[in-house]
Amino acid sequence: MMATSQDYFGNPYALFRGPPTTLRPRESPLGVGHPHGHGHLHSHAHAHGHGHAHSHYAALDLQTPHKRNIETDVRAPPPPLPPPPLPLPPASPRYNTDQGAMDQQFCLRWNNHPTNLTGVLTSLLQREALCDVTLACEGETVKAHQTILSACSPYFETIFLQNQHPHPIIYLKDVRYSEMRSLLDFMYKGEVNVGQSSLPMFLKTAESLQVRGLTDNNNLNYRSDCDKLRDSAASSPTGRGPSNYTGGLGGAGGVADAMRESRDSLRSRCERDLRDELTQRSSSSMSERSSAAAAAAAAAAAVAAAGGNVNAAAVALGLTTPTGGERSPSVGSASAAAAAAAVAAAVAAAANRSASADGCSDRGSERGTLERTDSRDDLLQLDYSNKDNNNSNSSSTGGNNNNNNNNNNNSSSNNNNSSSNRERNNSGERERERERERERDRDRELSTTPVEQLSSSKRRRKNSSSNCDNSLSSSHQDRHYPQDSQANFKSSPVPKTGGSTSESEDAGGRHDSPLSMTTSVHLGGGGGNVGAASALSGLSQSLSIKQELMDAQQQQQHREHHVALPPDYLPSAALKLHAEDMSTLLTQHALQAADARDEHNDAKQLQLDQTDNIDGRVKCFNIKHDRHPDRELDRNHREHDDDPGVIEEVVVDHVREMEAGNEHDPEEMKEAAYHATPPKYRRAVVYAPPHPDEEAASGSGSDIYVDGGYNCEYKCKELNMRAIRCSRQQHMMSHYSPHHPHHRSLIDCPAEAAYSPPVANNQAYLASNGAVQQLDLSTYHGHANHQLHQHPPSATHPSHSQSSPHYPSASGAGAGAGSVSVSIAGSASGSATSAPASVATSAVSPQPSSSSTGSTSSAAAVAAAAAAAANRRDHNIDYSTLFVQLSGTLPTLYRCVSCNKIVSNRWHHANIHRPQSHECPVCGQKFTRRDNMKAHCKIKHADIKDRFFSHYVHM
């Protein structure tokens, strides 16, 4: 990334200056490492309010950007650098200000810099290029880069600083080679996939190596540095570190040199951490931001300790009270009341962070901006380090008379007046910079958010099932970034079973990991380990959550194998079903379609009537014509739904049987067998009393079945009303003009056509509740298609050939004996998921017999009924015999009994097992569902008018 600042332009040789040779106080700090390393610097960041230079900071001048040179100065003096060609003018601060005001600055940002940097570093690691360290463990060696290891682990940084060697070899004891490879992947890429079994050891190794992002190492690292600085400051001759600086090198020259060098190294480290935090800000989630901001506060405290403000650093880090010398990480304030206030503030911060993800994002960006601005000020003014961390919201309000600044940048009454003055001077600038930062954050999010994260919520829901929820708080983050330095534990697809969520599961975002939670609480000034009560054991908690998920999955699988189903629902044998068997199960759905578990995933399906009877045994025997051998085909149709070959065979056998005559009367036998066999599903159906002459002709009253179902009263009323309507229709039609005898059988019993299984000629084999009303109208308006009965064209009655505007149909004329008549019953219901209308074909024998024409007339009636029933078939499926619901899953999942696949959309999966029954009338392509076929026609054959598809032929 490239960036410019007025300090850089005002002093072009600032980057090449050597160590200072004079002790004159600086009027204004120059750009310390800021012109490089992060994507944007604003020229007004340090322009005002820094003129209050204190005398004991006179010798501190960090112009060189090379951290390694600064840190190695402890060991060896730096090589002499050539002096700048032109000396600086004495009025350089004023010159800088004027130059910056006159010259317009341009901010050049590299949007995908973190991604590019990560990719290049990973490539270098894989190619072992430019490596300068070798790690040896378990007899294997792996090469890496000291810079990357030092940036990701203070442990390695200490090793490399203490052992100055161009290519050291580090032997790691008790570290597995695979773990070291995974740790390197995490350091270079920012993420790594680790198996559940090896996760505890991996995290333990990361903790021992102090890998940032996997352990709470920032607090420990800076605390140890502050301890060393405190000890060295306490061992100075005067007992006060700042006095050495105030008095020059005095009588303690060696101590002052050592202090200055250590302070320089600390300062450069803080700069680097802040630069890293600024660089990764665009690709970090909110959980990272909170922990990084807390680390920035710790860095500020460390710098304060380096400057000699030991009390300020101790209070900020929760190390010790100003008077007591013993370490107390739990209570870092001056009094117990202050500690309690800090803990309460930390808990409130956690609650606020989990309250709203959107609000948290905006507030987090504001806090991070304020924090970064303050941290830059801290780096340049070492006495200003007593400000608390904005993100943790814990203010040490105890009786520290040294430093007591508020989160709102208003300083309370204290003795450090210079800090409050600078705070007031910079408040206006911070407000302006905060506005600019907010706008840049928005732009950066729009420019760096990958396309995958902007996809639909459906994909996010699909992906969310593979993300294990490790959040100890209930905060879902709305911003989805590809990088996440906090350990983002991923597992194989395990359904989410626990954890309260503030948003829906579709958010699918990254969560606050317990590690970031403990980091922010530990680093929240004042209330270190006490505040960690909300995240008692971050690592073990996350592992226990994963263990609970795995246990829940095992229990769920155990329950799946021991689901108690009613005997009627259990298919025979080993559930090895073919397409025909699946279609058999699919057709057995009408009377059990009310599954209490359907409403979760199938809300988009139509809530249809449960009395859609495809294979139900509810019949009426009001008419003598009903006693027909066609009832024998009930079972055959249940076995061979949608199978044209089988249907044709049944038709031929049936016609052959009818032509053979009735040597033995099969009607009574079949009816007796029917009454002797208890029906599979009983419904209480009470029909209206039939017409007197029909009652005399039929010789049997209404059959009343006792219902064992759940919705008996409602269904009985509904069926009774429909039966009464059918009876009235029959009564009206009985007074019509005389018909052919088989017309009588067609017209007199629309109830049977609707409620009994259709005859063999109906290939689609469909019936529904909606078909009753439609059949009534179609019968009344002459949709029975009398030409199917081999009448001459003049024999059709005009009163029955008129068409209804609501139920149009095309009629095919049978042109003589031996021809095949086709009845096209159009469905004009306009449903998006309508199944095809059926075509009833009958092989007519050359000698027209009454039996064949009788079956043909019944087939015509069923064809009219099927026109409406076709709309309901695709959506009215009984899933209880096809799927087993898995308990304890969110979203609700189901296991298919045929293929054992676990799905969430049962309707879609059930259609996969159905035969390809819908054929495009234009190109002949077959589809499982009619709506898919219609969509195909509208796209592929758009030149054909849409009205064609409401009258197309079911091939």
UniProtKB/Swiss-Prot annotation:
Residues 387-420, 464-475, 790-814 have a biased composition (Low complexity). Residues 258-279, 360-379, 421-446 have a biased composition (Basic and acidic residues). A zinc finger (C2H2-type) spans 918-941. Residues 233-246 have a biased composition (Polar residues). It comes from Drosophila melanogaster (Fruit fly). GO terms for cellular component: nucleus. This is Sex determination protein fruitless. Residues 131-196 form the BTB domain. GO terms for biological process: aggressive behavior; axon midline choice point recognition; central nervous system development; central nervous system neuron development; copulation; dendrite morphogenesis; male courtship behavior; male courtship behavior, orientation prior to leg tapping and wing vibration. Residues 76-89 have a biased composition (Pro residues). It is found in: Nucleus.
